[in-house]
Amino acid sequence: METTNLLLPSTRMTRMGMVNPTFIEDAVIVSEKEQKKEHPNFIESNTSGITLEELETNCIVPSFGDNQLTISHQTFIHRIEEAASMFFAGETFGNTEIRVSHKILGRHPSALTKRKEELKPEDETIYYQRMAFCFHIRTICREINGEEVHLCIGGVRSLNEENLYGKKSPEKFKIFIGWRVRVCSNLMLTCDGLTGRLEVMGDTDIYIAALKLFQTFNPEQNLRLLETLGRTMISQEQFCQIIGRLRLYQVLPASQMKELPKVILGDSNINAATKGYIDNPNFGLRGRAKISCWDLMQLLNEAAKQSYIDKFLERNQNATDFAVGIQKALRWEDTENYGWFLR
């Protein structure tokens, strides 16, 4: 993706309250190197960073059993970038961040008889089973609850969900759009910003699905929902009650669990959120007597970054939904039994 774009007249963003200028002055071209600052990754766990060029030049593209190619990771990324550039015409995009995991190694036929220690890089084939990427829109940013946030777009692909031994079949992808906190790179996904599992036969379907998602997502409405979380406070006693209930939830009988909101955060996520409550420099106690529901959401979203790539988006959305639900329970507006986590 281009790291700098010329600003062009845009007709897509009127619902966000932006002015559509008739004349646009030449944009100031800002080097990405000048703007780039160190920031945390949007997902951690067992992932590693990779560039788009490395994906295109160093990685093979696996095929199905009938030798039809799968849609490559880089093609997936390009289609989302193209859809974003079309829908958000005139905006300036940041670099695309790519995280991968579960490296699958193979050998070229000429290296079949070599021992492992004799292998050279050119003897091996590589592809990554799981991949997540995101990029933010630099020119669409806001400040809520004292934090700068950017509109962010991305996707997830997990080849472990495909039956590569069979004939070509619909391939599975996930696309998202939502706000991301600049200081910690935490995503704040809601149900209207996530496609769920998308099954497609070709990359054109990815492009179309991305446009549909962008059209139905309301950034300002989403932002107002997130902003209200900063107005509801949680005492230390209430936080401890929430953590205890989250642990208890995981061992409840299925019949009782059905009566409660769905929570898919695991033990490691809950432990990380608890630790963050004490020592997170941005959203922890920091000498305060209380934290807000906004802080709770950030602690849970930060903890969700330790999930595997194929579970990450759902857990991030679940963390956001949970914080919103707790706020409603504290305001006596609870209709989904989130109050159970406070009793």
Predicted regions and their residues:
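A short acidic/basic microdomain associated with nuclease active sites
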Residues: 86-132
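General structural signal for secondary-structure boundaries
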Residues: 43-52, 56-57, 61, 72-78, ...
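Feature for intrinsically disordered/low-complexity regulatory segments and propeptides
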Residues: 1-81, 87-92, 96-100, 104
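Intrinsically disordered, low-complexity regions enriched in serine/threonine
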Residues: 1-35, 114-343
